[in-house]
């Protein structure tokens, strides 16, 4: 199972995301990196795989495209959610894998080719449609994505942990490559995700609190 380092960008800084309450996000300068500078942050931690959410572009207030491309040069793969709104609204660059999120991607996901679909979930429902996440993943079987990410926004930054029964339903609903992010708190949660059959775990807070070893993020894999 891949281990992917998550980080959010806002106002040219890496910020600590929590529950999707973006107005309150603060610079992440207390964890494994002494700097919240986007490129410096990646150089300090040296992950193999990186997930970036460009909050300014998702909200339509700015862009970190230059910083993202620089960060992508430093990793094997950089999964990027920058608020894609149409098939021609993708970022082209070395090592970049575009993410199309349900929050901004519109209602017709059949028009996209390639990239990853992020099933953005708040309060157990896909946003903005309000659909059941497992049902939505079943629909994604018919679309032309490389894989899917189940992003539990309500749990981001909380270390609430994962629910094995819910994870099993999600995994059973989609046969393709499937990552999970949001609330992963420790090695036990990673074991649950791996045993359930998830292909990747996107983590941040657990790493910065020391619950997951930094060298695991640097090698990019978890083996239970």
For each feature predicted by the language model, list its residue ranges.
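Surface-exposed amphipathic alpha-helices with a cationic face
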Residues: 68-75, 109-110, 167-173, 194, ...
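Short beta-strand/loop segments at the ligand-binding rim of alpha/beta enzyme cores
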Residues: 2, 67, 72-81, 95-96, ...
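Glycine-rich phosphate-binding active-site loops on the catalytic face of alpha/beta enzymes
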Residues: 83-109, 152-157, 182-216
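Conserved anion-binding
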Residues: 3-26, 88-156
């Amino acid at each position: 199972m891949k281990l992917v380092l998550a980080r959010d960008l806002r106002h040219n800084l890496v910020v600590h995301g929590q529950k999707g309450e973006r107005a309150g996000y603060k610079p992440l300068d207390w964890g494994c990196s002494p700097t919240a500078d986007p490129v410096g942050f990646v150089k300090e931690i040296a992950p193999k795989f990186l997930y970036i959410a460009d909050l300014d572009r998702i909200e339509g207030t700015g862009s970190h495209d230059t910083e993202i491309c620089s960060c992508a040069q430093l990793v094997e793969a950089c999964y990027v959610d920058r608020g894609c709104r149409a098939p021609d609204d993708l970022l082209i660059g070395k090592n970049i894998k575009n993410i199309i999120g349900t929050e901004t991607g519109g209602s017709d996901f059949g028009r996209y080719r390639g990239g990853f679909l992020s099933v953005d979930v708040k309060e157990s429902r896909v946003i903005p449609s309000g659909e059941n996440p497992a049902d939505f993943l079943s629909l994604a079987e018919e679309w032309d994505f490389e894989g899917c990410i189940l992003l539990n926004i309500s749990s981001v930054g909380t270390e609430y942990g994962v629910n094995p029964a819910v994870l099993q339903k999600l995994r059973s609903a989609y046969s393709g490559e499937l990552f999970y992010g949001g609330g992963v708190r420790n090695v036990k949660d990673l074991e649950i995700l791996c045993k359930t059959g998830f292909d990747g775990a996107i983590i941040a807070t657990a790493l910065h609190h020391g619950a997951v070893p930094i060298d695991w993020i640097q090698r990019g894999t978890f083996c239970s």
